[in-house]
């Protein structure tokens, strides 16, 4: 989001100057986003801050975690539109009057219909309206930030509110707040209990990363692909850049939705390309952009292909982002490539890591899908997503358009974590998320950090940074890329990109936590990225990335001077580092930071609240889908089985815990690292350690706490960091890492970064202590308190532990994290069906014994997600159950009211449960079938059967006979009535005279005959049935003779005793 803040113009000064103003505004806002950083942003920030922490403020104190604020970039998103109109509906939209030149940006906040409507009234406040950019020099750009607050209390709705990402402003805060708020995207995972976010719909996701990955497809997320809008601005990923790109070029775009066109337009203009995945609502504004909204609606299917109707370019394949004309700088959106969806429909790709390309600041040129230009060296970032083959899904990824993204050039060394395609397609959909939008900014950031060696990745995505040369450093507002989707649905940009981008950018918070490995957190990545990025810690933890910690981390590894830069000029170096952070968080991906987007569990660390501030973005990817995750590749390093056998939880939990506790920005990633990511680094365990994607890396990167400080505080960051920021974090990380072997890396990274602001806040991302952020200056707020809640850690992962740690993590919050954490903790608590934190993973038989014997229990599919869903639903259900029917009472009029319990319909099939066992009714070998030997019962055995005397009495026969008698009586009544009818009609006129009467007479006659026949046959059947009882006396005599003796004797014995 930050990107918006930075004037696309590339004026670096705004970015730099921003931080101070930002801080100021943040202070006022409490959670103000870093967003202020941008020129617009500054004005906006103040507004937003005031408006609501939710608003742009990054911090968004942990708003109802359930609520998922979605900041929607004004993209045309179909779904969102309606909501937009409703702007008032969900949250007050506070729009500060933007200068005329800006078209008014309207923050749209709407509760998402999808979402539970207003579970969190608070949410409403969250709207983030773009602040007038007046403060910034870039008036043209309209703060297009429309924030849609999705009140989604819906637990499952969209897993991730991707839209949030879109927050057009670049308010990181928006993003953050999204993350923070609820987006909780992080946990959007379906598993997540309903409350968390689930804004859009599914479970995953939602969260900063939401955009990147809607965790669930349920919600229809609309990815707003950039439409082909001519303007570059539009091209820009709207989400990120709205502000970023001055709207100037298309200031007034009207949005189709109610929202003031300006805003929308802004957004759209700004970012045409990046798709926003809105969780559900798309900004109407967007639509006004030309860009069609992309709907990444069904994750299941094409995995995200993001379809952007408007764009002719490879629709899903890639998005080309034109540079934003508005910006002075020619930032080309590299998005084009980014747009690709990574996954094919079905396959979820584990997050691919994206390595930021370290393009130099050169102007980015747009790249075609096929290749990425390096022109924009610094500016653009190439994100490499590598989809490791490891996951089978990876392939899918490839299939997706992602190819376009492939850019080999990228320096980044990212290895992408293996993509765990385990996630169902649904998940993958998310991935597409418009990472692009993040992309653009990120690139810039990245460039700043730039050049980290990149690990080879399979896919490289080019993430353009929007602000290429113009304001390379500052310009980057956010790095959109975070792939948080646990599913990896990462968009090229989104998922992995985030890593790279983020890492590149200031650590943008790439928190994409991809769940690649179910178990592993990519935590490491984040921290690495951070280092590399120099970015503070964008925790990139993407699980997915994990495999190559570097992958995501890849970027990280190369701390790239960023850290130095960081500390020195947070903005500069970070160039936005802070912003980046924020970006990171917001990252166009829409998931700020790491949403994990994994299906539902994304934690979206909405890292950094302010895009600009140096503060680290917290990204926390933490949660991974437990289910998905687990499925997903076991770990990079290890085979799935080891992960199953390994008792990962302890370490994971610990690592996470540690991480959380120590607030060190790097740690964020680090913590993750601890989890699995690290594994990439080298810890063997992580990789295989947990099959479940546990990733509760819950920590997001440090929150952006530093944001405030970022400007000069980088080194100081500690403030933000809370405990010793820079310095401490490294240690922390180490400790975290301790769990995972990779620690060294993260630690190093951290240490490297220390200076960098980002590093500092170790925010526990998950914990996302909004509080913290608030204090911090609002930017941190984004820290994602909400995400925290989202963060649901896999049980296996020992989510609880993690959670706990998170709670502890307050450091994150710097000071007040704890509340947030507490939420987080509660959220973290394991997903349903997860084992208790301490428990070791379920051990599965090594060999399938018998087809049938090993089948799942009745009515459960092996891959059934019922358990997960039940958790989310359970909360709702419980609430409803609490409203138990009132007891019997008599009202004033003497009417007696008796509670009626709905009883299940009576059906013969009630006791017939057909297990979902494919082999249940089929036999493959003769030995599967045994003829049951009939043994003749002895009279004595029969006599001793329970209730035999009752049966002998023939009560069933009598009952049946009585019913047959009733049938004959009914038939007799009908016969009588037909007779009367016939006599009444026919005699008056001769039947032969009228054809109609004749026909009626024949029909009556026929019915009378049928009645007679039925009566006769039923009576006959009844009589013959009762003959069975003719022998009753003899039978009873025999039974009493043979069976009674023993029974009587036994009873007598008992009586005697």
UniProtKB/Swiss-Prot annotation:
Annotated positions of the Phosphothreonine modification:
329, 865
Q: Which residues carry this modification: Omega-N-methylarginine?
A: 206
Keyword tags: Acetylation, Isopeptide bond, Methylation, Nucleus, Phosphoprotein, Repressor, Transcription, Transcription regulation, Ubl conjugation
User: Where, per the database record, does this protein carry Phosphoserine?
Assistant: 416, 439, 864, 884
Tell me where in or outside the cell this protein is found.
Answer: Nucleus
According to the UniProt entry, which residue ranges have a biased composition of type Polar residues?
A: 14-28, 620-641
Major location (coarse): nucleus
- Which Gene Ontology BP terms does the record give? embryonic placenta development; in utero embryonic development; negative regulation of cell migration; negative regulation of stem cell population maintenance; negative regulation of transcription by RNA polymerase II; negative regulation of transforming growth factor beta receptor signaling pathway; positive regulation of stem cell population maintenance
- Modification(s) after translation: Acetylated. Sumoylated with SUMO1.
Region: Interactions with SIN3A and HDAC1, residue numbers: 845-1057
Matching InterPro entries? His_deAcase_cplx_SAP130, SAP130_C
Q: Where is this region: Disordered?
A: 1-69, 619-695, 718-740, 827-873
- Cross-link Glycyl lysine isopeptide (Lys-Gly) (interchain with G-Cter in SUMO2) maps to 794, 873, 878
- Compositional bias per record (Basic and acidic residues), positions renumbered to this chain: 41-54
**Domains: entry comment:** The N-terminus may interact with a transcriptional coactivator.
What is the stated purpose of this protein? Acts as a transcriptional repressor. May function in the assembly and/or enzymatic activity of the mSin3A corepressor complex or in mediating interactions between the complex and other regulatory complexes.
Query: What quaternary arrangement does the UniProt entry report?
Result: Component of a mSin3A corepressor complex that contains SIN3A, SAP130, SUDS3/SAP45, ARID4B/SAP180, HDAC1 and HDAC2. Interacts (released by dead or dying cells) with CLEC4E.
Give the family, as the similarity comment puts it.
Belongs to the SAP130 family.
* Protein name from the UniProt record: Histone deacetylase complex subunit SAP130
What gene does this protein come from? Sap130
């Amino acid at each position: 989001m930050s990107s918006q803040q930075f004037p696309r113009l590339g004026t670096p000064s705004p970015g730099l100057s921003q931080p101070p103003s930002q801080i100021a505004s943040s202070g006022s806002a409490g959670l103000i986003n870093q967003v202020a950083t941008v020129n617009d942003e500054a004005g906006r920030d103040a507004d937003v801050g005031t408006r609501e922490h939710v608003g742009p403020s990054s911090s968004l104190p942990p708003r109802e975690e359930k609520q998922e604020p979605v900041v929607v970039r004004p993209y045309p998103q179909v779904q969102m539109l309606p909501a937009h109109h409703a702007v008032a509906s969900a949250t007050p939209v506070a729009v500060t009057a933007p200068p005329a030149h800006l078209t008014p940006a309207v923050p749209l906040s709407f509760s998402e219909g999808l979402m539970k409507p207003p579970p969190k009234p608070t949410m409403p406040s969250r709207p983030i309206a773009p602040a007038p950019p007046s403060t910034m020099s870039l008036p043209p750009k309209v703060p297009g930030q429309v924030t849609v607050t999705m009140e989604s209390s819906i637990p499952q709705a969209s897993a991730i509110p991707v839209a949030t990402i879109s927050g057009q402003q670049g308010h990181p805060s928006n993003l953050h707040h999204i993350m923070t708020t609820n987006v909780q995207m992080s946990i959007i995972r379906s598993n997540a209990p309903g409350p968390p976010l689930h804004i859009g719909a599914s479970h995953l996701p939602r969260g900063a990363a939401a955009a990147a990955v809607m965790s669930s497809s349920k919600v229809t997320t609309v990815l707003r692909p950039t439409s082909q809008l001519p303007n570059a601005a539009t091209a820009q990923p709207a989400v990120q850049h709205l502000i970023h790109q001055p709207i100037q070029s298309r200031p007034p775009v009207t949005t189709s939705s109610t929202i003031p066109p300006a805003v929308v337009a802004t957004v759209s203009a700004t970012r045409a390309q990046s798709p926003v995945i809105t969780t559900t609502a798309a900004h109407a504004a967007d639509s006004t952009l030309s860009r069609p909204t992309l709907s990444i609606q069904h994750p299941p299917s094409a995995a995200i292909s993001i379809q952007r109707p408007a764009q002719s370019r490879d629709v899903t394949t890639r998005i080309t982002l034109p540079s934003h004309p508005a910006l002075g700088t020619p930032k080309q959106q590299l998005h084009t490539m980014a747009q690709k969806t990574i996954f094919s429909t079905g396959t979820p790709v584990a997050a691919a890591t994206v390595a930021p390309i370290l393009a130099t600041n050169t102007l980015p040129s747009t790249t075609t899908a096929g290749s990425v230009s390096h022109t924009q060296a610094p500016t653009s970032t190439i994100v490499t997503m590598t989809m490791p083959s490891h996951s089978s899904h990876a392939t899918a990824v490839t299939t997706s358009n992602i190819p376009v993204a492939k850019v080999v050039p990228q320096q980044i060394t990212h290895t992408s974590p293996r993509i765990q395609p385990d996630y169902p397609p649904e998940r993958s959909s998310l991935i597409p998320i418009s990472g692009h939008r993040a992309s653009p900014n990120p690139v810039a950031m990245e460039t700043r950090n730039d050049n980290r060696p990149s690990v080879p990745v399979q896919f490289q995505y080019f993430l353009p940074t929007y602000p290429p040369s113009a304001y390379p450093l500052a310009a980057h507002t956010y790095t959109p890329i975070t792939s948080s989707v646990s599913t990896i649905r990462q968009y090229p940009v989104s998922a992995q990109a985030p890593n790279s981008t983020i890492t590149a950018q200031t650590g943008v918070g790439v928190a994409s936590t991809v769940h690649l490995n179910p178990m592993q957190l990519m935590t490491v990545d984040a921290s690495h990225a951070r280092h590399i990025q120099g970015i503070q810690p964008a925790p990139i933890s993407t699980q997915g990335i994990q495999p190559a910690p570097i992958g995501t981390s890849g970027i990280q590894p190369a701390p790239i001077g960023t850290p130095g830069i960081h500390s020195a000029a947070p903005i500069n170096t970070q160039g936005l580092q802070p912003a980046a952070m924020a970006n990171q968080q917001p990252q166009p991906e829409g998931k700020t930071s790491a949403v994990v987007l994994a299906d539902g569990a994304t934690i979206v660390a909405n890292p950094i609240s302010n895009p600009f501030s140096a503060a680290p973005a917290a990204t926390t990817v933490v949660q991974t889908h437990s289910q998905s995750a687990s499925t997903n590749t076991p770990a990079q390093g290890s085979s799935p089985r080891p992960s199953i056998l390994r008792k990962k939880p302890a370490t994971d939990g610990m690592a996470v815990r540690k991480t959380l506790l120590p607030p060190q920005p790097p740690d964020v990633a680090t913590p993750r690292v601890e989890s699995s990511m690290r594994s990439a680094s080298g810890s063997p365990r992580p990789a295989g350690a947990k099959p479940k994607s546990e990733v509760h890396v819950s920590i997001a990167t440090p929150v952006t706490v530093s944001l405030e400080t970022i400007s000069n505080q980088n080194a100081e960051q500690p403030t933000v960091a809370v405990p010793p920021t820079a310095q401490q974090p490294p240690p922390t990380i180490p400790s975290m890492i301790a769990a995972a072997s990779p620690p060294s890396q993260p630690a190093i990274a951290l240490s490297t970064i220390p200076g960098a602001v980002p590093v500092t806040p170790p925010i526990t991302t998950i914990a996302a202590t909004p509080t913290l952020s608030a204090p911090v200056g609002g930017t941190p707020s984004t820290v994602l308190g909400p995400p925290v809640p989202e963060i649901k850690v896999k049980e296996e992962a020992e989510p609880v532990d993690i959670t706990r740690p998170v709670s502890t993590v307050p450091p994150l919050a710097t000071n007040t994290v704890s509340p947030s954490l507490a939420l987080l903790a509660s959220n973290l608590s394991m997903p349903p069906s997860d084992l208790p934190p301490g428990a070791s993973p379920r051990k599965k038989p090594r060999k399938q014994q018998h087809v049938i014997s090993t089948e799942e229990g009745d009515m459960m599919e092996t891959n059934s997600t019922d358990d997960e869903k039940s958790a989310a639903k359970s909360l709702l259900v419980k609430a409803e159950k609490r409203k138990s029917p009132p007891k019997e009472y008599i009202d004033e009029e003497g009417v007696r009211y008796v509670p009626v319990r709905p009883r299940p319909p009576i059906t013969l099939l009630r006791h017939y449960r057909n297990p979902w066992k494919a082999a249940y009714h089929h036999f493959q070998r003769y030995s599967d079938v045994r003829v049951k030997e009939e043994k003749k019962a002895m009279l004595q055995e029969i006599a001793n059967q329970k209730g035999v005397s009752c049966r002998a009495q023939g009560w069933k026969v009598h009952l049946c006979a009585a019913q047959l008698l009733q049938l004959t009586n009914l038939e007799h009544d009908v016969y009588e009535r037909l007779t009367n009818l016939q006599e009444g009609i026919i005699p008056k006129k001769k039947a032969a005279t009228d054809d109609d009467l004749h026909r009626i007479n024949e029909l009556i006659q026929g019915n009378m005959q049928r009645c007679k026949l039925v009566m006769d046959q039923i009576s006959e059947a009844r009589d013959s049935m009762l003959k069975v009882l003719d022998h009753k006396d003899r039978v009873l005599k025999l039974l009493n003779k043979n069976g009674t003796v023993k029974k009587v004797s036994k009873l007598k014995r008992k009586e005697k005793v």
